[in-house]
Design a protein with these regions (language model features):
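Surface-exposed amphipathic alpha-helical tracts and adjacent flexible/coil segments at the periphery
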Residues: 1-28, 32-44, 56-59, 65-75, ...
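Hydrophobic, small-residue-rich alpha-helical packing segments that form membrane-like cores
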Residues: 90, 109-114, 132-134
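Charged helix-capping and loop-helix junction motifs
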Residues: 48-54, 83-88
Length: 426
């Protein structure tokens, strides 16, 4: 389905919250996808989740593409959740899901009983080798604690090799780390701010994101408000590691996890593609240690940085991987993406023999030749192109609202796909 090497030793794991994002992840070169169903996952409220009825279809789509499927069941599990948890794990087994991502021992034990592979969530806060050795009896992959630096990660990786720490299925346990996306003010998501203020528990997948709002510091006795340098004092910037990805991989990280199940397919497509290219360059550089490749990598990093800035982000920082102990906070609400998408219309037909898509412009006044476009759909994923050689009943440079028009595309599109205009910001 794609030209990407899915047999790479480094796994790119993409977030999926919709069929559009699923298609985007596959086409961009993801090795695996992770997603939630029902309410026992850490994005139960903020992301569009699938249902148990979707499992067989998701697994079938991914198997055809050679992509692994991981189901998140990583919230705190209360007594009244046990039956639902068991039902979800049973459905996952029947559908052929490759692994369950878990943080509660009840989920791990039941998954093991059902012979379903387990991956350890970062919610477990595993930060040392001894803890990892204990949990290895249940799992094959571990997401280490987010606040670890790469020296500490490398030390744990060395212990895995030297002490021959193996997972439940007998293979050396693999280290997974987040490489890109949103970070929590509570570092690993163990936050009670939303629960305390709105009775909506982040640890149950219902974070209300009130840390992302602007706040003032007020003296209760005098009502004096203090001005602070940054009113978004609890909203961290997003993680980006592509400029030191080689250090992560050299430290022993073998699964790169992208955050963003609540994001659109264009986010998934762009981020997966950039990190896939970076991993392939790292693998090539290990084979041929040529100095020119260092310059080439530096040039590519600048390109990737520019591309990653076009999709949702709150500004970027390195996380804690390089030894920084204090977080970096955003100074704005919402996204700092350099492009925004504006709904423009829909695909009304696709002519496979000539590679031409027909669209109805229904939501913006005009579309001009040279405009950047985004098309999304359940099968299409996220396809970007530029409006060139547009035709109505004749060649045109401007299309008016309500008109049908056609353009050549390099990928097949589908009737019902959504058309967006991509506008530059700033």
């Amino acid at each position: 389905m794609t030209p990407y090497n899915r047999t790479s030793q480094v796994e790119i794991m993409a977030p999926v919250g919709s069929y559009e994002s699923l298609a985007a992840a596959i086409k961009a070169g993801a090795n695996s996808v992770y997603f939630g169903i029902e309410h026992l996952n850490m994005r139960a409220r903020s992301a569009a989740n699938f249902t148990t009825d979707d499992l067989h279809k998701i697994v079938a789509i991914c198997r055809e593409a050679g992509v692994k499927t991981y189901l998140t069941v990583n919230t705190v599990i209360y007594p009244e959740d046990i039956e639902m948890m068991q039902t979800i794990v049973n459905h996952a087994k029947q559908a052929g899901v490759d692994a369950i991502i878990a943080s509660d021992i009840a989920v791990m034990q039941y998954a093991v009983q059902q012979d379903v592979e387990v991956h350890l969530s970062t919610q477990l806060n595993i930060a040392n080798t001894e803890a990892l050795k204990f949990y290895a009896q249940f799992a094959d992959v571990v997401v280490l604690a987010r606040e670890l630096n790469l020296t500490q990660v490398a030390s744990i990786y060395k212990d895995i090799q030297e002490q021959d720490i193996r997972g439940r299925h007998g293979e050396p346990i693999r280290i997974e780390m987040f490489c890109h996306g949103a970070l929590c003010m509570a570092v690993r998501g163990k936050c009670y701010l939303s629960l305390h203020n709105l009775n909506s528990s982040a640890n149950r997948g219902a974070c209300a994101q009130i840390c992302r709002r602007a706040y003032v510091v007020k003296d209760k006795s005098s009502d004096i408000e203090l001005e602070v340098d940054n009113e978004y004092i609890m909203s961290p910037k997003d993680l980006k590691t592509i400029h030191f990805l080689d250090q992560m991989l050299d430290a022993g990280v073998r699964v790169l996890k992208i955050e963003g199940r609540a994001r659109g397919p264009e986010y998934v497509s762009t981020v997966v593609r950039c990190y896939r290219e970076a991993v392939e360059m790292w693998e090539e550089s290990r084979k041929s240690k040529v100095e020119s490749r260092k310059t080439e990598m530096e040039q590519k990093i600048a390109e990737w940085d520019k591309q990653l800035a076009t999709v949702f982000n709150r500004g970027f920082w390195n996380g804690y991987y390089l030894g920084q102990r204090l977080g970096e906070w955003t100074n704005d609400y919402g996204s700092k993406a350099t492009k925004k998408k504006v709904y423009a219309g829909k695909c009304t037909n696709y002519f496979k023999n000539i590679g031409v898509a027909e669209f109805l412009l229904e939501a913006i006044p005009e579309l001009h030749e040279g405009d950047d476009l985004l098309v999304t759909g359940h099968t299409t994923g996220a396809y970007e192109c530029t409006a060139r050689e547009m035709r109505t009943d004749k060649p045109v440079t401007v299309v008016k609202q309500g008109e049908l028009f056609a353009i050549q595309t390099t990928e097949p599109l589908h009737r019902g796909d959504k058309l967006y205009l991509l506008e530059s910001i700033g």
